[in-house]
């Protein structure tokens, strides 16, 4: 007897949204034996999934999707169908409204509207999208007027680059609008999750996800403030953090050019939106949002002029992923262009970046400065010949490493002056 047969629930699952979370989730469920309908309103995305031509840096994702489709258990299309369970994995971006940043529930509301014609008594709706506290309860109140349904929130907790591994191994928190909803959702996830599954109410589950990312955002803000102080007083923040973290109860994260991605840079605002007491959270978010401008000012200070050519290495929000959402690089590039700089970006990982991407040679040709904004392994592993090639093309042998990843000695041997964000000893 399979887990699906044993649980006796949700033989048919409709997953709305086939992005970074929805596609792996739909594929994982299909492999477990569920009849899965994967839905995305983007026809191009649906076509690429069907043809297995979509781009991804996730290890083994293409193999998983291929297996799910070939099994006959995963069908991909642009419209929902009747199902026992509906899992919603759509974006919930942050928008500015009356001077305040708030969660934009447009995609979530459209997803809910799209499944309403197919809802039947006894159906379960699971929301994986990150949402402000109280959203799941609000959705339940609206939908339960006409039918007896169950609603739960099960926020994703995965790290891009390791999604499949963490989808299976990470613990999960599931919050239901009632105990039955939480239990029903648990029966779905325990078919593939090997980590522990903790049950609670919906509002607590919503807050747990926001707290996880807010904790990291506040910690990074502290590191970024330390970096600014280090430059001011003449110490190397990276050395200081490493030594401070020798204390068994201290774990300061790393500073950088800002915080990006669709979680850490967004989620804290959902708490601020709901509470006037979130003063520290707001301050941390504002500090991290200020870092791209800090980097731009540092560039101008280093090259000692207010115009020139800047080569940007790395436009994704973190290293070795293709995701450019909320990337600090976008803000850095935008500000530089606004101030009259010529900017060329190089990133072989990135997709869907708002500005054109160039080859390495194109980016560095005639550059006044190279700026590292993402910790891709490629940049860490530049060898002597790579650096010689770059040195032969730049106008000035100057590099600003905002992630502290370069082999400084190699670059200096080729005549480069290497600056590191937060290193006040070598400013």
Curated annotation (Swiss-Prot):
Its EC number is 1.1.1.336. InterPro entries: 6-PGluconate_DH-like_C_sf, NAD(P)-bd_dom_sf, UDP-Glc/GDP-Man, UDP-Glc/GDP-Man_DH_C, UDP-Glc/GDP-Man_DH_C_sf, UDP-Glc/GDP-Man_DH_dimer, UDP-Glc/GDP-Man_DH_N, UDP_ManNAc/GlcNAc_DH. NAD(+) binds at residues 20-21, 40, 45, 92, 130, 325. GO terms for biological process: polysaccharide biosynthetic process. Keywords: NAD, Oxidoreductase. It catalyses: UDP-N-acetyl-alpha-D-mannosamine + 2 NAD(+) + H2O = UDP-N-acetyl-alpha-D-mannosaminouronate + 2 NADH + 3 H(+). The active site is at 209 (proton donor/acceptor), 263 (nucleophile). GO terms for molecular function: NAD binding; oxidoreductase activity, acting on the CH-CH group of donors, NAD or NADP as acceptor; UDP-N-acetyl-D-mannosamine dehydrogenase activity. The keyword Oxidoreductase applies. The keyword Nucleus does not apply. UDP-N-acetyl-alpha-D-mannosaminouronate binds at residues 157-158, 209, 213, 216, 247, 249, 260, 317-318, 403. Pfam families: UDPG_MGDP_dh, UDPG_MGDP_dh_C, UDPG_MGDP_dh_N. Belongs to the UDP-glucose/GDP-mannose dehydrogenase family. Catalyzes the four-electron oxidation of UDP-N-acetyl-D-mannosamine (UDP-ManNAc), reducing NAD(+) and releasing UDP-N-acetylmannosaminuronic acid (UDP-ManNAcA). Homotetramer; probably dimer of dimers. NCBIfam families: NDP-sugDHase. This is UDP-N-acetyl-D-mannosamine dehydrogenase. It comes from Methanocaldococcus jannaschii (strain ATCC 43067 / DSM 2661 / JAL-1 / JCM 10045 / NBRC 100440) (Methanococcus jannaschii).
């Amino acid at each position: 007897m399979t887990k699906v047969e044993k649980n006796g629930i949700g033989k048919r699952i409709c997953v709305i949204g086939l992005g970074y979370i929805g596609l792996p989730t739909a594929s994982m469920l299909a492999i477990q034996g569920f009849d899965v309908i994967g839905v995305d309103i983007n026809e191009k995305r649906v076509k690429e999934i069907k043809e297995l031509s979509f781009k991804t840096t996730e290890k083994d994702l293409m193999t998983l999707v291929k297996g799910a489709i070939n099994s006959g258990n995963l069908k991909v299309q642009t419209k929902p169908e009747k199902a026992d369970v509906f899992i919603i994995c759509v974006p919930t971006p942050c928008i500015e409204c009356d001077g305040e940043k708030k969660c934009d529930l447009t995609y979530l509301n459209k997803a809910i509207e799209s499944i309403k014609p197919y809802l039947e008594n006894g159906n379960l709706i699971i929301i994986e999208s990150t949402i402000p506290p109280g959203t799941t309860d609000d959705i339940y109140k609206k939908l339960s007027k006409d039918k007896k349904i169950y609603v739960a929130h099960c926020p994703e907790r995965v790290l891009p680059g390791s999604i499949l591994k963490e989808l299976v191994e990470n613990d999960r928190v599931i919050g239901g609008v009632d105990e039955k909803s939480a239990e029903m959702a648990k029966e779905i996830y325990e078919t593939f999750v090997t980590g522990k599954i903790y049950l609670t109410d919906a509002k607590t589950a919503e807050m747990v996800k926001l707290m996880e990312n807010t904790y990291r955002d506040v910690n990074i803000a502290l590191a970024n403030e330390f970096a600014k102080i280090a430059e001011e007083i003449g110490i190397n923040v990276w050395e200081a953090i490493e030594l401070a973290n020798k204390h068994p109860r201290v774990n300061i994260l790393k500073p950088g050019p800002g915080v990006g991605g669709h979680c850490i840079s967004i989620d804290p605002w959902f708490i601020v939106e709901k509470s006037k007491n979130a003063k520290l959270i707001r301050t941390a978010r504002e500090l991290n949002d200020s870092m791209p401008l800090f980097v731009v000012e540092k560039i101008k200070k280093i090259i000692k002029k207010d115009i020139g050519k800047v080569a940007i290495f790395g436009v994704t929000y973190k290293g070795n992923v293709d995701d450019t959402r909320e990337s600090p690089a976008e803000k850095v590039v935008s500000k530089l262009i606004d101030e009259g700089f010529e900017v060329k970006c190089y990133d072989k990982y990135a997709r869907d970046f708002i500005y054109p991407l160039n080859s390495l040679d194109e980016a560095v040709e005639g550059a006044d400065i190279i700026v590292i904004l993402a910790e891709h392994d490629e940049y860490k592993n530049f060898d002597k010949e790579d650096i010689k090639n770059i040195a032969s093309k730049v106008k000035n042998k100057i590099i600003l490493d905002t992630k502290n990843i370069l082999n400084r000695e190699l670059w200096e041997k080729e005549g480069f002056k290497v600056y590191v964000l937060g290193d006040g000893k070598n400013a």
